[in-house]
A protein has these predicted regions:
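Intrinsically disordered, low-complexity regions enriched for glutamine and histidine
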Residues: 2, 22-24, 95
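Bacterial N-terminal signal peptides that target proteins for export
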Residues: 2-13
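Bacterial N-terminal signal peptides
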Residues: 11-24
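Mature catalytic domains of secreted/periplasmic carbohydrate-active enzymes
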Residues: 26-546
Length: 546
């Protein structure tokens, strides 16, 4: 029988152990922003050292393969790149932002960072809903990310019905959680959370539907993404989670949209090689037709490895397929001609001679799923697609599924409505090339990144033009209520070719038309064949391109 004294000693010991654990937790989560970057980086390197050999092997493979194909890791060689015809023909793709950030479903896909920004809406919401960031950090959402209703086959079927020709899921976002079966990390969807190779399943399902498959990597941004968490008591400061949270350096950024030469954020050679190895791993495992990168690949410390990756990927794509791959880049990260420029949430004011792409989200607020979201209309998406295609570009439209793997009904309906329009009018979009002018009409497009919602409503006088062989397509962006349309660019007095025939896609009506000095006058039927926009197939007495 134990004495009261023995019990008191035991209780005291338990109390001391508990206090020690609390003190350790407080110390481990204490702010570390004042530590020097090299020390912080060494902590990440040590935490992820179990994969050093695998990383080094992939980097070595990249450097060897850079000497085994037509491309070399320098800009002069990379600028001989030519965009594959399939990509120019495709016009419309689906982007997917899906990850652990879909669990809190608050703010936007930058929740993993903003939840640590003291005073932000995400910071306040996180404390109210889950507790303080040193007790419940971003990592603690991972077990809640179950994806129990995720069906890659159902997604792929929907994307095909939407009229998309390629699909690009985010393989790893800024948060550092890989959505694929990586051999370079324990923090992956294949090993935690859903315990499924999401990217592998999507690759198989998308290709089974006859669509092209790509991946998006935002691994490089993880270098700084969670650095703000070092300014408050948080789990990011705890070295036992460094393999997931990464270096988490302080972001010393220059203004967005300009060259990153003056971005002084600390980037170690180890991180640059980790980024290169992760990219090479995605190429080797999934043979993507497209690799999409966000803006930070232009950071000065990354650029030497960027040319290595580009040469490796282009050479590899020629080995495993019948065409060279496509790299999407932003701003000034890559040299002109070496890849495909991407404008985030933006459009151009005129035809660009080099092929380009816009990526935007069907959501008005976020790239990932959030509660109480609002969405773009089918008309908005279709009009944007038409305008971009007329200017020699593609549209990559993003969706954000819920954490359980379901796609909101509102999003599905937008995609299906776009697909229904393309089913009738696709000849005016797929496989087309720009005409001598992109279009006409009074409505001016708000050009540049992050302006895609600034364009005012189109009028019946607004048209966009595309060509295919000797056919011109004139796409009207609003149906005239009086049934009469005039295409000024086809006036005889401004060099318009003699028009032979005009057909309204989706209609059996025989159109009456008259080519006059002020334009091509058309009498349209009482009812438009489709909502949102209509397409006219125009042929000429002589070859269009003579």
């Amino acid at each position: 029988m134990l004495s009261h004294r023995s019990l008191s000693i035991r209780n005291l010991g338990a109390t001391l152990i508990a206090l020690s654990a609390i003190l350790h937790a407080q110390t481990a989560s204490a702010p570390t922003a004042s530590q020097d970057p090299e020390s912080i980086d060494r902590t990440w390197q040590k935490a992820s050292s179990k994969y050093d050999e695998a990383r080094a092997s992939l980097v070595k493979q990249v450097e060897a393969d850079d000497l085994q194909g037509p491309f070399r890791p320098d800009w002069e060689s990379l600028q001989r790149y030519e965009v594959p015809e399939w990509y120019k023909d495709a016009k419309f793709g689906i982007f997917i932002h899906w990850g652990v950030y879909s669990v809190p479903a608050f703010g936007n896909e930058w929740y993993p960072r903003n939840m640590y920004v003291e005073g932000s809406p995400e910071y306040k919401h996180h404390i109210a809903a889950y507790g303080h960031q040193d007790k419940f950090g971003y990592k603690d959402f991972i077990p809640m990310f179950e994806a129990e209703h995720f069906s890659a086959a159902a997604w792929a079927e929907l994307f095909k019905k939407a009229g998309a020709k390629y699909v690009v899921p985010v393989a790893e976002h800024h948060d550092g959680f890989a959505m694929y079966d990586s051999g370079l990390s324990d923090w992956t969807a294949a090993k935690m959370g859903p315990r499924r190779d999401v990217i592998g399943e999507l690759a198989k399902a998308v290709r089974a539907e006859g669509l092209r498959f790509g991946v998006s990597s935002h691994r490089v941004e993880h270098d700084f993404f969670l650095g703000v968490a070092r300014t408050i008591p948080s789990d990011v400061n705890d070295s036992q989670y460094a393999a997931f949270y990464g270096p988490a350096h302080t972001w010393l950024a220059n203004p967005s949209g300009v060259p990153l030469n003056d971005d002084f954020t600390y980037v170690s050679s180890a991180w640059a090689d980790d980024w290169l190895a992760r990219g090479a791993e995605l190429v080797e495992k999934y043979h993507p037709d497209i690799v999409y990168f966000d803006w930070w690949i232009g950071q000065a410390s990354i650029r030497p490895n960027l040319t290595k990756f580009a040469a490796f990927y282009y050479n590899s794509s020629l080995k495993y397929g019948d065409h060279v791959g496509v790299i999407n880049y932003k701003d000034y990260a890559m040299q002109a001609h070496s890849a495909v420029l991407d404008l985030e949430r933006g459009q151009l004011g005129d035809i660009r001679s080099l092929y380009w792409q816009t990526d935007t989200s069907v959501s008005n607020k976020s790239w990932g799923y959030i509660k109480d979201d609002t969405f773009k209309s089918p008309e908005f998406v279709i009009h944007q697609l038409i305008d971009i295609v007329s200017k020699n570009g593609n549209l990559l439209m993003n969706i954000g599924p819920r954490s359980d793997g379901t796609i909101p009904d509102e999003v599905q309906q937008v995609l299906l409505d776009v697909g229904a329009w393309l089913n009738v009018n696709g000849d005016a979009i797929y496989g087309t090339r720009p005409w001598r002018v992109f279009g006409e009409g009074p409505t001016k497009v708000a050009a540049g990144s992050f302006h895609d919602t600034d364009t005012t409503r189109y009028t019946p006088e607004d048209f966009r033009f595309t060509t295919k062989a000797d056919v011109l397509y004139a796409i009207g962006l609003d149906w005239p209520t009086n049934g009469e349309a005039v295409i000024r660019s086809l006036a005889q007095t401004v060099g318009g070719e003699p028009v032979k025939s005009v057909v309204l896609l989706g209609s059996d009506a025989k159109l009456q038309f008259d080519q006059r000095a002020d334009g091509l006058h058309l009498r349209l039927p009482a009812q438009a064949p489709t909502k949102y926009a209509y397409a006219l197939r125009v042929t000429f007495d002589r070859a269009l391109h003579e």
